[in-house]
Structure formats: C-alpha cells, structure tokens
C-alpha cells in the first residue's frame, strides 16, 4: 500500500534523494518529500536546485512512430525522429516564468504552459503524465532524437526546488547567479503516469484522461451549458494621458469609454441580434486608471460616476448580460493603503522587483518610462478579501481578476513565499470571491484556477510555434470543452481577423472582441495604445454576426461532430457553408 522507496545517492555532491513509487488502480506515481532530501555539503555551496524523476520513461526509440503532446498555448505535437536535431529542444516553465526576476532585455514573446500535463502517444497506446503536487515549480523538457546527445526521443518534468536570480556585475566580474537561501519551500513533489491502451491512440486520449482527472480529483465541476453561444466583449474605460494646460504638460485621468458610451456599444450590438453577451469592463475605477491597488469597487467620476455606472449595470441586468468589472493588481503605484517601499515583491537577489518597459526596436530597457513595482503576494489575502466584500456591497454579480488567474510569482524577502505558496494563497482568494456570491471570470486560466472559474476568456488559439513543434492542436480546448465556457483571444486583435474567427469557432471558442469608444488617435502615447485596432464603430457589424456563425459549432456538444464544408469570399463578406445546406449558414460583413 505504501509503495516502494528507492534512495538515490549522489556522493560527489553529498546529496541523497529518496523517491517513492506507488502503483494505483490506473496510474503509477513517483513522489519525493523534500524534507527527506539530505544535503551534506551545503557549507561548500552544493545544494539541490532541480530534480527530474523518470526522465526517460516512455521515451521513443529511433525507429518508433509517435509524438509528444505539449500543452504550450493551445497545444502542440512534437513527432518522434522529426529530423530537427539542429533546432533547440523544448523547455518551458509551467505557468510561465517567475516575473519576480527582471531580465535586462525583453524576453521572447511566447505562449505559456497553462496545464501541468504532457502526453506520449504511440501506435496503440498513450500515456498521460500529470504533476500532482509541486506544479508551481516545474519545468517541462522535450527533445527529439539527436538533440540531447541521445538517440531517443524524451519528454519529462523537472522540479525547480530552489529558484535563481542574477546579480548584474560591472567590470570584469561578469554576472553572478544566486539561489534561494534556506530549506526547500515545496514540501512534496509528485508525478502521476496514466497509461491508456487504444488501437488508434491520439492526443484525444491524453485530453480525455486529463479531463477525467480534473473532474474526479481536481475539484472541477461542469459549468458549461450546451447549445449556447455568447459573445465576450472587453471594454476599456480610462487611462492616464498627458495634456498641455497653460503650456505645462500634466498627466490626467482621461475617458476612452465612459459608462454611457459602454451602454451605447452594448445596446448597439443587442439591437443587431446579439442576445447573449459577457461584458468585461477594464479600467473602470480611479485606482484602476491610475495604476494603484484596485479593490474598492468605486466607479470613476471621469467615466461618469456612480449614476452612469448604475444605469449601465441596470441595463445589463435587464438584458441578462453577464457583467465582470475587472481589476489588475499585478504591478502598482503607491496609494490606496499600499506603498512601493513596503509592499513590493523582493527578488532572490534581495532587491525590489521593478518591472521595466522595453524599447520596441532593441528590446532593452525603455528609460523614458518609469519602472513599476510588482505587488507582493503577501498582500493578496487582504486585497482580494476587501475586493470580494466591496464588490458584494456594490451589488455586482461578477468579477475578473485579470492575469491573477494565470500568473504566479514568489516573494523572497520577509514574506518568504515561493511560487507554490503564492498559488495556494491565490486559491484562497478565489474562494473568498466565490463565497461572497460573485461569479469569477478567469483571464487565460491556468489549471490551479479551473475549480473556481465560471468562465474563461482569452484562451490561446495557437502554440508558441517553436521550430521543434510539428503542428498545433486544440488541446486546451479539448480538455475544457463542455466543462467551463470559454472564449478565444480577441478576434479583432489579430492581423488576420477572418482567420482568427475561423480558428476560434473551429476550436470551440465563443467569439471575443475588444472595443473602445474613442478613436485610435486618442490612444496615442497612453497605456491603451496597443488597442489601436479596437474602435467600436469599425467592428460592430462584424461582431454582431459572429455569434450566429459560432452557433454552428455549439449546436452539438462534441467539438468535432460538426463540419464547415467551405468558406467563400463575396462582395458582402465572408460566407460559411455547412454540409447540411447549399446556402450560406451565415455571412460575416467585411471589416
């Protein structure tokens, strides 16, 4: 019942690691209690920083057919022996990098791993590998034959037991890498291996296994309703903008979408037949606009104040549209009871974590913009406890916490919190929001937030597209389809909006759009200038037609049981045909 424990000794490093293997009804588990790891040469600076268990388990032979299922973004496949020995092997941290560290050059823009799982698929079998404990500190590695001085194709998780940071030194000393002090924070790490026997095994088997794990042991309950399609609409209220007053440049809160204008946008869509809508309102409070910690739920006077806000919420309630006022409490400025010299996250290098902006041309720090302080996870319980209370008092029914449902980081100062500690704290915050009666919309939701999310927005439609990948698959969507309703990334944010729309409905996503009332020219030199594409008048007609087209997909609960037979461009727009009719099922107007 207790399994078997095998002790691995690394005499040169003075490290001993006992690993417990246990065979259950449908899986094999490998686990390590980190308190049992013995380190005898710590005084010499030798400590355990990373741990890989069963690194070659399920490896593909040089003459074997099969592939790895990688949950990068929407999902990707790496086929065995794909001849890409000269490309970089795959390595990525689950839930993204620890943003506490601040690189001097801009990191590559890639998708994240949102689920601590990978799959190995061969001709007549598959294996699903799931991190059961320690998912906040795990890295996924994959390499095809020839990439890692091995003739085998391998994929495995590695646990980062101690985080690292860099001291940037001047002169001839170079940069110094420093690691976390003290004992390992993560109490236990555990991985499960679920085998599946299937004559025609595929990544669908991996998705189904992980889906069952979430429903049976991950605390996830089905919330999606069959045969419904909703439009997800992101509105952006205000921002800080520099104006010249008597020749003096002054930065003021400026409205880009007031509460009355938001009502106008929504009512315009409703008038064109959009009957199911999920509305997310960003930057709707003074704190949200100015970048301070935002938890008071007080509508900004710049956008129309409480009177106009109440008119908006009354209208949305009357139309039965779901409303999620959003907050973004990742970086912050002093104010509202939180101060940068007290509440900023401390890096492993013992310095403040100041998030910098990067020059678009060269990727180095943009010195024309001030750095922003990263909010300490030690404040989260208070911040979101107050937010839940204030949202309820304001009569709101939903909340969006921004990227706090997909991003985790540690605080290595007095708080002494690792990433997994932050994950646990965030889950208690989600519970506080739910227990106050609020519905929670998760922005690009990571697995640790699945049990608490009522809806998910901004689901990735593609992978990072690394050279070692062979093709993208909708793995994320397959796992969640029929469990939690979700939307894809904003269709109008794409350079090819028509292709983005087709990809969205093909992967089972509800259509999503970003909209701002102000003209694109008004956004210049503001924090909202990246939404230059989102002027509402340009997209209203196209967006209004999208839910009807997406209904083709939602008419069946199976993601792959419908068929778009052809797509045709015409003078009026994009026509979508199905196998059931010779007439267009829907036509999207040209945008």
Q: How would you label these PLM feature ranges?
A:
Residues 196, 200, 252-255, 302, ...:
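Hydrophobic alpha-helical scaffolding
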Residues 273-277, 319-323, 395-397, 436-438, ...:
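Short, well-ordered coil/turn segments that N-cap beta-strands
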Residues 54, 268, 272, 315-319, ...:
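Structured segments of extracytoplasmic/periplasmic soluble domains
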Residues 229-314, 318-382, 406-410:
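Aromatic-lined carbohydrate-binding/catalytic grooves of carbohydrate-active enzymes
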Residues 32, 269, 316, 402, ...:
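Conserved, mostly hydrophobic/aromatic
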């Amino acid at each position: 019942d207790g399994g078997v424990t095998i002790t691995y000794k690394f005499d040169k490093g003075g490290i001993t690691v006992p690993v417990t293997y246990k065979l259950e009804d449908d899986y094999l588990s490998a686990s390590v209690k980190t308190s049992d790891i013995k380190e005898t040469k710590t005084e010499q600076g030798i400590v355990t920083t990373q741990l890989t268990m069963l690194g070659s388990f399920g490896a593909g032979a040089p003459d074997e057919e099969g592939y790895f299922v990688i949950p990068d973004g929407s999902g990707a496949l790496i086929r065995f022996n794909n001849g890409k020995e000269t490309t970089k092997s795959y390595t990525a941290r689950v839930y993204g990098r620890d943003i506490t560290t601040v690189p001097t050059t801009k990191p590559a823009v890639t998708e994240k791993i949102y689920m601590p799982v990978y799959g190995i698929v061969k001709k007549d079998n598959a294996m699903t590998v799931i991190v059961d404990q320690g998912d906040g500190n795990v890295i996924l590695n994959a390499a095809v034959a020839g990439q890692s001085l091995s003739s085998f194709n391998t994929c495995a998780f590695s646990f980062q037991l101690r985080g690292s940071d860099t001291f940037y030194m001047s002169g001839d000393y170079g940069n110094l890498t420093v690691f976390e002090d003290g004992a390992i924070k993560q109490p236990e790490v555990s991985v499960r291996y679920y085998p599946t026997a299937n004559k025609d095994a595929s990544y669908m088997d991996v998705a189904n296994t992980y889906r069952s794990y979430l429903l049976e042991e991950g605390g996830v309950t089905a919330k999606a309703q069959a045969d419904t399609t909703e439009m997800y609409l992101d509105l952006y209220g205000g921002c800080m903008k520099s104006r010249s007053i008597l020749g003096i440049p002054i930065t003021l809160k400026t409205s880009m979408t007031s509460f009355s204008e938001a009502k106008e946008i929504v009512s315009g869509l409703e008038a064109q037949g959009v009957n199911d809508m999920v509305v997310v309102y960003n930057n709707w409070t003074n704190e949200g606009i100015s970048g301070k910690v935002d938890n008071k739920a007080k509508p900004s006077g710049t956008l129309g104040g409480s009177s106009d806000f109440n008119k908006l919420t009354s209208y949305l309630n009357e139309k039965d549209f779901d409303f999620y006022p959003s907050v973004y409490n990742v970086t912050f400025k002093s104010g509202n009871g939180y101060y940068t010299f007290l509440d900023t996250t401390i890096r492993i290098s013992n310095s403040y974590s100041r998030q910098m902006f990067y020059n678009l041309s060269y990727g180095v720090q943009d010195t024309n913009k001030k750095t922003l302080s990263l909010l300490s996870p030690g404040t989260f319980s208070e911040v979101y406890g107050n937010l839940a209370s204030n949202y309820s008092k304001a009569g709101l029914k939903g909340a969006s916490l921004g990227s706090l449902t997909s991003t985790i980081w540690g605080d290595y100062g007095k708080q002494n919190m690792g990433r997994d500690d932050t994950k646990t704290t965030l889950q208690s915050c989600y519970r506080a929001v739910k227990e106050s009666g609020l519905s929670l919309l998760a922005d690009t939701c990571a697995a640790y937030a699945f049990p608490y999310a009522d809806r998910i927005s901004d689901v990735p439609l593609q992978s990072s597209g690394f050279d070692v990948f062979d093709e993208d698959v909708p793995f994320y969507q397959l796992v969640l389809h029929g469990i939690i309703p979700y939307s894809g990334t904003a269709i109008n944010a794409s350079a090819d909006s028509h292709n983005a729309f087709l990809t969205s409905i093909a992967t089972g996503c509800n259509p999503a759009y970003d909209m701002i009332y102000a003209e694109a020219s008004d956004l210049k030199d503001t924090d909202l200038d990246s939404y230059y594409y989102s002027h509402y008048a340009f997209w209203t007609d196209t967006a209004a037609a999208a839910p009807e087209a997406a209904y083709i997909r939602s008419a069946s609960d199976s993601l792959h049981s419908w068929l778009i037979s052809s797509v045709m461009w015409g003078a009026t727009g994009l026509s979508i045909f199905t196998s059931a009719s010779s007439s267009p099922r829907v036509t999207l107007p040209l945008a």
